[in-house]
Amino acid sequence: IRGVADAHRKYRKELVSLSDKNIRIALDEWNYWYGDYIYGELGVRYHHKDALGVAIGLHEFFRNSDIYFMANYAQTVNVIGCIKTTNTKSGFAATGLPLKLYRNHFGTIPVFIDDEYDDLDIVAALDPSMNKITVSIVNIAQDNKSISLDFGTTSIRPDGRQWLIHNSDPEAYNVPGEKPNIRIEEANITLRERRLSIPGYAILVLEAEIE
């Protein structure tokens, strides 16, 4: 995702024919595809590690939203899908959970992040009304990580919410009709100390109101 965006930025600089044009990228399909066909043709099983990858993929689209106009996740049901079915049951595969989480709770106005952490992929965004900020962190390491939150001159209310997708086993997966091994967990949190702990192999989305 990043490589395609970087290549198109290079084309814009080097090709005179593009100097006066704003041609953006419409990515026709993106997803993982591997493994046995458990849910029919191309009906592969997705694991928690794939959910982490999907979240990081979304992060790259957010960072490059100036040049990506559209990106279509492939697919929806069974065929490399984020929803899996049997004859009588259906349920979210691991990869469907970050798609659902970000769609429901992540902001739409990107915010610049000026720091980097080993094993952590971080993005932030404001909601359309600019009254809330969301911060998303993906921890690809086995160990828990802790970071400090610095919102600069922006005043943040001391209480917030978080949504967490976590499993200590990156190979964990969900089965339709059974209790999910991977799910979205919501909790109220305090931001008074501006410290945040992220479990290993986790996707964490934080929401805070701006005063």
Name these PLM-found stretches.
Residues 20-132:
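Aromatic/acidic polysaccharide-binding cleft in carbohydrate-active enzymes
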Residues 1-15, 24-28, 32, 57:
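Extended catalytic-interface subdomain
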Residues 116-118, 129, 141-143, 183-194:
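Ser/Thr- and Asn-enriched, surface-exposed coil loops between beta-strands
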Residues 119-156, 162, 202-207:
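Carbohydrate-binding surface patches
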Residues 14-20, 66, 154-155:
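Short helix-capping segments at alpha-helix termini
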Residues 210-211:
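Short, charged beta-turn/beta-strand-edge "cap" motif at the junction between a beta-strand
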Residues 11-15, 57-61, 120-124, 136, ...:
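Generic recognition of flexible, low-complexity loop/linker segments
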Residues 154-198:
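Acidic, Ser/Thr/Pro-rich beta/coil linker or hinge segments at domain junctions
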